[in-house]
Amino acid sequence: MILQVVLLLACLSGAIVSTGACCPPSRFNAFQYVTIVNSTTRTRGLYYMVYDGPNERYLLTGDRLKNLYGTTRVIYDYKKGIAYNIDVQKRSCTTFPLHGKFEDQENVCVPRDAVYTGRSAYGFDQGALHSWSYEYNRTHPDGRHQNIETTVTKENCIPIVTTTISTDASGGNSLHILGYNDFYPGIRDISMLEIPSYCRA
């Protein structure tokens, strides 16, 4: 009887671990280190992100590798379906339409259909950061197919690194690696998400 209980608990534990569907705090700030590679180009950048889940919007600003940190910012507002590309120094702004769903952007959350692929620890002993990894696939209306692997902290589902392999309709491949650091729950400066008057006009 004891053995049956142990086996049942082990099965339940495995089922819980293998289930996706978790999200980090609904509002946060973080730096994103981005690497994009395809057959013709390689791009790297370090951006600052402000994520406002309840209002379905987020901001990416600057690129410290090109000395643009703080001078340019893009605000993606999915409730309005508009993105604002803002140059703070030049006081200029352009807009472009947004498509798709907010929750599918930046792969911040682990979706329900994600498959658990293993766990790991960064560091050692009591100072180790324990993490879980998942894998899932997405097909987009434009024909792109994506295989996504993501690693998040065991506690609070905070993203650590996401790797996306994309194949377009013509068969071309690209690799997108997104790493997070200096993660801070909540929004330190909500004014960064305000649309300036010269952009609304």
From Swiss-Prot:
A motif (Microbody targeting signal) lies at residues 199-201. GO terms for cellular component: extracellular region; lysosome. Keywords: Glycoprotein, Secreted, Signal. It comes from the Eukaryota. The keyword Signal applies. One of its GO terms (molecular function) is calcium ion binding. Residues 1-21 form the signal peptide. Glycans are attached at N38, N137. It is found in: Secreted. GO terms for biological process: cell-matrix adhesion. Pfam families: Ependymin. InterPro entries: Ependymin (IPR001299). Component of the acid-soluble and acid-insoluble organic matrix of calcified shell layers (at protein level). Belongs to the ependymin family. This is Ependymin-related protein 2. It comes from Haliotis asinina (Donkey's ear abalone). The lineage of its organism: Eukaryota, Metazoa, Spiralia, Lophotrochozoa, Mollusca.
